[in-house]
Amino acid sequence: MVEAVVDSGAVHSVAPPGVFPGRVRPSLWSRAGRGYRAANGTSIKNLGEVDVPFATAEGHRCRIPFQIASVEQPLLSVSHLTSAGNMVQLRDTDGTIVNTTTGRSIALERRGGVYIMKMWVPDAAAPLPFGRQGA
């Protein structure tokens, strides 16, 4: 299980290298040499992106592209979520992400002043649920 911090100031959803399984592929920003700026002003290089399939505590199967960079923990961009058709609601003790088309919702936990989304990420080494026909 991976915990991502919901970040209303993040342009992209970003994670440190090695947190998510899968091949890091070049992204628009990594190819253009663009990166990020940390809160203390230091520059952070964009290393590419990983498409992350995951399940939520509610059993929803989701997929989000994460940019890979030397950040401390996975950050989930509110801007990216809302651009993808979701509404993010943050309350005093918790929050939710609601898909405006399907109505599906994902619970967020508020801990230490930040909102956390729990992601159950499949192991890259796990066998696929269906074998290829003729294999």
Where are these regions (language model features)?
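Aspartyl protease active-site motif detector
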Residues: 1-36, 65-70, 76-77
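Sterically constrained small-residue positions within well-ordered secondary structures
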Residues: 6, 27, 43-45, 57, ...
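Basic, gly/Ser/Thr/Pro-rich low-complexity segments located predominantly at protein N termini
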Residues: 14-15, 46, 53, 82
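Generic recognition of well-structured, leucine-rich alpha-helical segments
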Residues: 22, 27, 39, 82-88
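Aspartic protease core domain of the pepsin/retropepsin superfamily
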Residues: 51-135
